[in-house]
Amino acid sequence: MINPGDNAQEELQEALILMSEGDTLLIKSGYYLFEDGLSLDVDNVTIIGEGLDKTILDFKNQQSGAQGFLVTSNKVTLKDFAILDAKGDALKVIGSKGINMINLRTEWTGGPKSTNGAYGFYPVESEDVLIDGCVAIGASDAGIYVGQSKNIIVRNSIAQYNVAGIEIENSYYADVYNNLASHNTGGILIFDLPDLPQQGGHHIRVFDNKSIDNDTDNFAPEGNIVGEVPRGTGIIIMANSDVEVFNNEMSGNGTVNLSIVSYSDETDDPNYYPHPRRIQVHNNIYLSLIHI
């Protein structure tokens, strides 16, 4: 168990290193101000706080580490805490088989800025990914991002004031449902890009979501692909196959509610297919236009 205090950072990182498989670590309610990033590389463990508004890990004074919290192990559950103002990505997960992120919050508290970290939730090259009941605010790329992964669920979550609210990129077999994406530049993005180890994104379902009032100016750093997303976009599907979009509400998006597009930049990747295929859109509620 970790309590707030002057030595909380050292105690928490030591506890993360010394955990054994099957352990649960409780981070008690309170405010924790950290100067260094945290990391976890132990399989089959649970890290739990006492609420996403009660256990607060604040990285505004972070001096080292490319992210607030880095996970590189399997069968991990993270639950009931917040990560604020990380120097880079808030919560990054690499190469995990079985990662559960439940009732977590990532936020940059100074409002939308290009100097904010790129990603709130950032699992990549992972399998069996669950993001459930989470909140992502203020990321300069995507609040909730899953990339080059497979067997994914993103549900019951809120993404606001990010460039992209929720983004599934170069991934296979994802269900995105019962989420609220609002006041982002773009609400929900389903992208496939060239020159990555895993591409040909396919079998994505986007349903029972609200992608509404996405009205924040694009604040992505220059050169970032999401910097091309126009303010006021509900859902974009780019270069994926076998995508189904249904039972969503899309409204109050000033540019377009639903856009289905090809990847338009030049690429030398011989294995990349830039056009969307087998896209189904049905039973949605929306205002303004569909652009194909």
Task: State what each model feature region is.
Residues 1-26:
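Acidic Gly/Asp/Thr-rich repetitive segments characteristic of extracellular carbohydrate-active
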Residues 59, 290-292:
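Conserved small/polar residues in nucleotide/adenosyl-binding loops
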Residues 2-10, 44-88, 110:
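Right-handed parallel beta-helix/beta-spiral solenoid domain characteristic of secreted/periplasmic
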Residues 35, 59-69, 85-92, 113-123, ...:
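Extracellular beta-strand/beta-solenoid scaffold signature
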Residues 172-190, 194-210:
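Acidic, glycine-rich loop-and-beta core segments that form the ion-binding/anion-interacting portion
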Residues 12-18, 33-42, 47, 95, ...:
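Short, T/G/N/S-enriched strand-turn elements that build extracellular solenoid repeat scaffolds
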Residues 20, 42-43, 52, 72-74, ...:
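Parallel beta-helix/beta-solenoid
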